[in-house]
């Protein structure tokens, strides 16, 4: 899948060039203050590389929140400019817009070594192509206006760099509409592509997928694509109950059941069998009398089933042993979705046990990739982000890659030289 082999910033001659970088500064804000600067800090190596390799200017563009195509002050990137200034230890010029004649003039011939941050891209309808007006009505962008918006962005630099993996699955103007002859990945995006290509193009085997999450229907495309690639697959989380009920007639009580997904369970299991993929389902569960931290809990086997009025919220200790054995065999592991409701400590043991085993496997030389979203949150909770090979920064984007889809923001980049 050489579609992931793209031109990267370290293959470019940046001397004297204005470098336009699409970053992901979509940071959490509370009362106008940044509560977690991780996304800003993560972009610093790409910015520093451009500056230390003689770039005339670095122009940064990002979205923040969902202003839906109109200016809303609570979504301003102004606080990001201050944070960036502190991290780079140099001045950052913040512009009040991201396109238009004034912005173009400010970016045309800036002082050498300038860092410029543009205002929120999504203040303009033309970034996403659609939005919501002040009255709450849905509106679509006019194609001529989109073209003009993209042309204005293109004028702000000589070279385009994309370092926003979290938005790579969106065909937004800043992701696909900048018309420079050289369009490269920054270090964050390059790192994401390199790890996913290790898993999806040429994995060391056995290759294991660990899948969790609530609905089978949401993961059908993911399961189908991975069945063509993996040797073993663990199915945990809420969707395991639908599999067990359909395939083995297990009583699941009030556990999550996905009517839509249930229709395809047998087809997926037959496909796994035909392809020689070993599927591991839970054999026991930790059940609760309600969905709450203070629920009364106990462990039951799949044979016993979940009694009515109870729901399974985690996998049990025997399941964890079976899963651990599969992890110990694997040389490549992709994990997308927790084993249980790890947000409640009482029902976190299954996910924590998987995490411990994945960390051990990494130390023993396996390539281990945690897809974004809830599993990345679990890695943060258990402080294991630096103890696995890679934690993806993009929930939706990583899911679409694993589903076998082409990401528009990646597709728009120049091929590697």
From Swiss-Prot:
Keywords: ATP-binding, Cytoplasm, Glycolysis, Kinase, Magnesium, Metal-binding, Nucleotide-binding, Transferase. Its cofactor is Mg(2+). It is found in: Cytoplasm. The keyword Magnesium applies. CDD domains: Phosphoglycerate_kinase (cd00318). Pathway: Carbohydrate degradation; glycolysis; pyruvate from D-glyceraldehyde 3-phosphate: step 2/5. GO terms for cellular component: cytosol. Disulfide bonds: none annotated. ATP binds at residues 214, 219, 238, 312, 343, 374-375. It catalyses: (2R)-3-phosphoglycerate + ATP = (2R)-3-phospho-glyceroyl phosphate + ADP. CDP binds at residues 213, 218, 237, 337, 339, 342. ADP binds at residues 213, 237, 342. (2R)-3-phosphoglycerate binds at residues 23-26, 38-39, 62-63, 65-66, 121-122, 169-170. Mg(2+) binds at residues 214, 217-218, 374. Its EC number is 2.7.2.3. GO terms for molecular function: ADP binding; ATP binding; metal ion binding; phosphoglycerate kinase activity. GO terms for biological process: gluconeogenesis; glycolytic process. AMP binds at residues 214-215, 219, 238, 312, 343. Its main location: cytoplasm. Belongs to the phosphoglycerate kinase family. Monomer. This is Probable phosphoglycerate kinase.
């Amino acid at each position: 899948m050489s579609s992931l082999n793209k031109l990267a910033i370290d293959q470019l001659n940046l001397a004297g060039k204005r470098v336009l970088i699409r970053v992901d500064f979509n940071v959490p804000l509370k009362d106008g203050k940044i509560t977690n600067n991780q996304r800003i800090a993560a972009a610093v190596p790409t910015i520093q590389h451009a500056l230390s390799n003689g770039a005339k200017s670095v122009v940064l563009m990002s979205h923040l929140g969902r202003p839906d195509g109109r200016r809303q002050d609570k979504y301003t990137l102004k606080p990001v400019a201050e944070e960036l200034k502190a991290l780079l230890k140099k001045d950052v010029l913040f512009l009040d817009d991201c396109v238009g004649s004034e912005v173009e003039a400010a970016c045309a011939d800036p002082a050498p070594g300038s860092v410029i941050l543009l205002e929120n891209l999504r203040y303009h309808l033309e970034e996403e192509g659609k939005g919501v007006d002040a009255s709450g009505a849905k509106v679509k962008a006019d194609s001529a206006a989109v073209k003009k918006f993209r042309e204005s962005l293109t004028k702000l630099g000589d070279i385009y760099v994309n370092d926003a993996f979290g938005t790579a699955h969106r065909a937004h103007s800043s992701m696909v509409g900048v018309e420079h002859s050289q369009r490269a990945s920054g270090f964050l995006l390059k790192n994401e592509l390199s790890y996913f290509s290790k898993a999806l193009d040429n994995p060391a085997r056995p290759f294991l997928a660990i899948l969790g999450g609530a609905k089978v229907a949401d993961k059908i495309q993911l399961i189908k694509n991975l069945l063509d690639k993996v040797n073993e697959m663990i199915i945990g989380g809420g969707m395991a109950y639908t599999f067990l009920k359909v395939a083995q007639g297990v009583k699941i009580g009030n556990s999550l059941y996905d009517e839509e997904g249930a229709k395809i369970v047998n087809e997926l299991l037959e496909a796994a069998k035909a392809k020689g993929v070993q599927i591991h389902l839970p054999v026991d569960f930790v059940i609760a009398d309600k969905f709450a931290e203070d629920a009364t809990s106990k462990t039951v086997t799949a044979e016993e089933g979940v009694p009515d009025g109870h729901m399974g919220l985690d996998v049990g200790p025997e399941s964890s042993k079976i899963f651990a054995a599969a992890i110990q065999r694997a040389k490549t592991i992709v994990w997308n979705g927790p084993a249980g409701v790890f947000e409640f400590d009482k029902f976190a043991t299954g996910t924590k046990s998987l995490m411990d085993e994945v960390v051990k496997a990494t130390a023993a030389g396996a390539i281990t990739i945690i897809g974004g979203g809830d599993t990345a949150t679990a890695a943060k909770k258990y402080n294991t982000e630096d103890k696995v090979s890679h934690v993806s920064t993009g929930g939706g984007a990583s899911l679409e890659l694993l589903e076998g889809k082409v990401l528009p923001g990646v597709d728009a980049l120049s091929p590697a030289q």
